[in-house]
């Protein structure tokens, strides 16, 4: 179970403004899950750039959990979102980033993401001393596990092809995290309260991807191996 820790009262935090545009909302005007995923990775990138740390490392996301905050709802088209992000935990070669999403001072969504630094060849590397110089105070010594449970596709799950597009690829040649969330958007119907997406392996150009789904879950498979899994609760979260 994902823990959504409260904002740190000390150390670094970073905020950015992100309006919900046409390309972020569904036909009812509610922000899509992949739109939220883009906002999360954009504010994370902006925060990292703002630190002034000069490094050739790239951060890739391993797990992302998004939930409707108590009393919150899903944002709508043209609303201006304030994303406030901070580092909430760490391990040997990963860090947890918490992000709150608000509109007009009201907290709507909470997110917790596990990020892994990789070198130019895509191999994970240990957190550098510079990381702790910038984020160590807000982390406050909180350690988080980096392992994720082995995925199992349930018996009877429906299956269909999930064609890849060149527009889905990111700078390291993998299908971008936000593009993966489009698969979740395709499967989820109605309001959801919480979604957790886990990346178990890369999905790359040229892969033949199968989308398997069952109530409350989906999997992206390459050669029968699960590369991405997701679990969600659909209980009619508020959208207005």
Regions found by a protein language model. Give the residues of each.
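HotDog/MaoC-like acyl-thioester-processing domains
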Residues: 11, 65-154, 202-208, 214-240
């Amino acid at each position: 179970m994902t823990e959504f820790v409260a904002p740190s009262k000390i150390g670094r935090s970073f905020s950015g403004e992100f309006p919900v545009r046409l390309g972020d909302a569904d036909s009812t005007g509610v922000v899509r899950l992949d739109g939220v995923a883009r906002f999360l990775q954009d504010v994370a990138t902006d925060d990292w750039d703002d630190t002034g740390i000069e490094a050739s490392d790239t951060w890739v996301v391993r797990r992302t959990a998004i939930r409707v905050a108590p009393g919150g709802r899903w944002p709508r088209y043209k609303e201006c979102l304030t994303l406030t992000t901070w580092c909430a935990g760490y391990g040997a070669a990963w860090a947890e980033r918490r992000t709150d999403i608000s509109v007009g001072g009201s907290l709507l969504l909470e997110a917790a993401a596990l990020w892994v630094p990789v070198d130019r060849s895509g191999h994970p590397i240990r957190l550098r001393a510079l990381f702790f110089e910038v984020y160590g105070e807000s982390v406050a010594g909180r350690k988080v596990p980096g392992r994720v449970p082995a995925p199992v596709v349930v018996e009877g799950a429906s299956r269909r092809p999930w064609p890849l597009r060149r527009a889905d690829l990111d700078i390291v040649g993998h299908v971008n995290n936000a593009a993966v969330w489009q698969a979740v958007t395709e499967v989820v119907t109605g309001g959801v309260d919480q979604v957790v997406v886990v990346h178990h392996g890369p999905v790359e150009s040229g892969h033949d991807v199968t989308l398997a789904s069952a109530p409350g879950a989906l999997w992206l498979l390459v050669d029968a191996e699960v590369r991405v899994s997701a679990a969600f609760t659909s209980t009619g979260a508020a959208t207005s």
